[in-house]
Amino acid sequence: MLDANRIQQHESAAHEKRNWIRLTAQCNNRCTFCLDSDAHNGTNISPMTIKAQIIDGKKQGATRLILSGGEPTIHPNYVEFIALGRRMNYRRVQTVTNGRMFSYKPFLDKCLDAGLQEITFSVHGPNAKIHDALVGVRGAFDQEVQGIINSLEDGRPIVNIDIVINRMNVKYLTQMMDMFIEIGVKEFDLLQIIPFGRAFHEGLASLFYDFEEHADYIQAALAYSKRPDLHVWVNRMPPPYMEGFETLIQDPYKLNDEVRGRKEEYDELLAHGTALSCKDPERCRRCYLDLLCGQLDRTIEGLQEHSFETLRADKPIKKAPYDDSKRAWAVAKNVIEAAQIAATLPGAELILECDDYSGLAIDLVDGVETALVAGKRVVRADAKTPAAIDQLLALGGNFEIAVHLTQATAAHLHEHHNPAPARLAFTISNYELVTDNWANDIYLPAFFGTYDAAGAVREGIPACQGGKTPRRRPSVFDARMLGEDGKLDIFGYAHRYIEESYYTKSRRCRDCVHDLECEGVHINFVRSHGYAPLMPVLAADEDAGPVAAVA
């Protein structure tokens, strides 16, 4: 596993705000896997448009400028764009290129003198035969290698290499990496081929490969990440095939970039119901966005059919997407703010998620002790801190207390509330950053193996971790997915998908008796702790206790 400093470096880099600008709609290669080929029309973007984007990106807070294409180096104003990026004080000016133009040293010198700081070369074969066949130009490999050598010998730019993994090169990944390591390259980005552009239209049979059959080749390449002198990144690779190298799984934050690249189509889908042009079963099953798009379809359908039983919000909303939901869910700092939110939401029942429950009172309604907020009956309150646990238990009442298990709450329960009080249920939080997982997560089998919670509900905790079949998480529509116009917004949706729905399982989970109903765990749980804790339950005895992870 990578050390903590390396992981934090990767996480900071993934979350850096970038201004990715396409300079051209043309290329001097014709890659068989080009995902942008449908947008190529043989033109360059106007210099004024590009310069405006460079300036605007900096105003919007971007710190890294990435000049891309098509092929960016063939734009006649390429050097000007580099210079403008430096004048705008971007922390880093980077380009992604096929590198052929950098085989001409005078051109490279002009670019570096203008302020180009990082060059990402796209190389796809260990030799001219494979590379040139993939990029469609004889001699391209020799030119690109010369460009890499020129850049390394100059010493000024950071040099790294992108490799699009496909059927023609997957068996040669380590050979390619060895060759470029030998001449001084220290950073590689391994990109899984995706079914867009020519990759789908022309390369479906020749470029896509079976993961099971080629897993050993992928694992061998990932093993280079163990070397302290190298940086290895992986993009769009199905996470289950990265077991043993889970810290290399693409940061889920980068899904926002994937969505941004198809924003216009997503907007058409949400505004007018226009199906995505890429919608095709053969394509979708090979696409890294398949789960995100599938959940989006279900979200749209749920809104249309009013099938979400719970509507959640973290601020008062002007208009609910529909007014017949059963339950409201208010996320707030305190009960006063929660009441203001709840008053704008439909539903007779209420879930509270507050940092501080001071002021929450119990009323006697029809002879039953009940908490009422904004006229709604509280059926559940989430507790994320020891203080919240104590506040809620002291109140009495008949609502459920859903404790989010963290290092702090687990220790508090062991010391002050063991065995588990009758109203407690247990769940776990998802985190945006791996470093937050490290700071908060507990080893669940150890907790449930030592804490007396036999009768307590587990929600969203796999049976192998909690020792019994969990209750599924409630069906929730989160109002944070809505734009200012009150309609579903693709970036709001993507953010909530990453936080709430981006779950994964180990390949061995297929053998578990709970596989069909189990959601798995959040992607950042796996990026933090690996797939090792996920061990299939092979007997239907739910009370056998949590399954210990392999050593």
Predicted regions and their residues:
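Canonical Radical SAM [4Fe-4S] cluster-binding loop centered on the CxxxCxxC motif
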Residues: 11-49, 290-293, 297
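Accessory C-terminal segments flanking Radical SAM cores
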Residues: 196-311, 417-547, 551
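N-terminal [4Fe-4S]-dependent radical SAM core
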Residues: 1-21, 255-274, 290, 310-336, ...
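Short acidic/His/Gly/Ser-rich catalytic and metal-binding motifs that mark active-site loops
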Residues: 30-33, 130, 196-201
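Soluble or luminal CAZymes and related metallo-dependent hydrolases
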Residues: 45-49, 139-143, 168, 172, ...
